[in-house]
């Protein structure tokens, strides 16, 4: 028998992850002028979130990849992500209700995929009031 509480919790998590994915698409479009065509978000354990964004590169970046300049694409994306990190962090914190303690972005230019990674402060409600 399926536990209705567990099913409802899974549905709520699915809705939350969809909101994160939609927000990442919107942020990329706003910050970089183009949003990804596919986005998926997943919890990676209790205190981490991974967003996989596909088909994110700008036309000029795709041309750079064709020229063999993948490292330049990585470097320029890294600078852009550092400049916009606060927007990405605050958006995820608002949606999840969790405090982000670390954020990192990575790009695979050859596959045209960006990874947005968020590490949260431990959830004290889940962990109890255990001292560290």
Model-found features: residue ranges?
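Interaction-mediating elements
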Residues: 1-132
């Amino acid at each position: 028998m399926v536990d209705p509480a567990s099913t409802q919790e899974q549905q709520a998590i699915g809705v939350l992850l969809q909101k994160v994915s939609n927000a990442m698409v919107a942020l990329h479009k706003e910050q970089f002028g183009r949003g990804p065509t596919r986005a998926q978000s997943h919890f990676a354990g209790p205190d981490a979130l991974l967003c996989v964004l596909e088909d994110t590169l700008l036309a000029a970046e795709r041309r750079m990849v064709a020229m063999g300049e993948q490292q330049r694409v990585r470097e320029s994306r890294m600078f852009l992500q550092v400049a916009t990190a606060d927007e990405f962090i605050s958006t995820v914190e608002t949606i999840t209700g969790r405090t982000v303690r670390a954020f990192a972005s990575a790009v695979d230019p050859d596959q045209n995929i960006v990874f947005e990674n968020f590490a949260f402060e431990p959830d004290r409600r889940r962990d109890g009031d255990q001292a560290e």
